[in-house]
Amino acid sequence: SDVCSSDLNDTFELVSPILEGEDGLEKLERVCWVLDSCNVKINGSCGLHVHMNAEDFNITTWRNLLLSYKHAEAEIDKFMPASRRGGSNTYCGSLIQFPDERIRSARNIRELQGLFPSRYMKVNLQAYSRHRTVEFRQHSGTISFTKIENWVCFLDRMITFASVGSLPAGIRLEDLDR
């Protein structure tokens, strides 16, 4: 994410080390507090990119994760700013145009990476080759700990769910609460 100092002339990208569990969330909360107390501002081009460990994913988990995110994308878009919705953002492309059958027929991560060849997708599979992570790029830049924590928890639950199943097409937010 690009963030600006209070005079809006000094921009920088903030990259955290690997954060895990409650300890990681506590560290993140402290960083967000420091950024806020320094009057750091986020510009409109910012994105929050979250890498989640994918080292132990099997092909079923990968397929389920992509299908679930794709099927829930329209609902996820509803809690994102307009600049991060649909396929209009160059840096976080939509998954909607990719046929379910192509995702289901992939035999390994390389085939899925071939189907989603750009890293500039809401779900970036290219990160796996280098970092052994799946990168989620849809969220807008923020220094709000609450927003980041909620997004990370949502993604964690989606990954947990993907290890056992996938969401059907046409899912609604109300359905996700059940």
Residue ranges with predicted function:
Residues D2-S5:
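Short, small-residue-biased leader/transition segments that mark boundaries at the very start
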Residues T11, K41-F57, H131-R137:
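Histidine-centered divalent-metal-coordination microenvironment in nucleic-acid enzymes
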Residues T11, W62-S140:
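Aromatic/basic-lined ligand-recognition segments
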Residues E13-E22:
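The substrate-binding groove and active-site-proximal loops of carbohydrate-active enzymes
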Residues G21-C32, E55-P81, S144-I159:
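Helical (often loop-to-helix) elements that flank the catalytic cores of nucleotide-handling enzymes
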Residues V34-K41:
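Catalytic micro-motifs at enzyme active sites that drive phosphoryl/nucleotidyl and oxygen chemistry
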Residues N43, A74-S88, T160-R178:
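Flexible helix-coil linker/hinge segments at domain or subdomain boundaries
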Residues S129-V134, Q138-L167:
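Long, repeat-rich segments with strong aromatic
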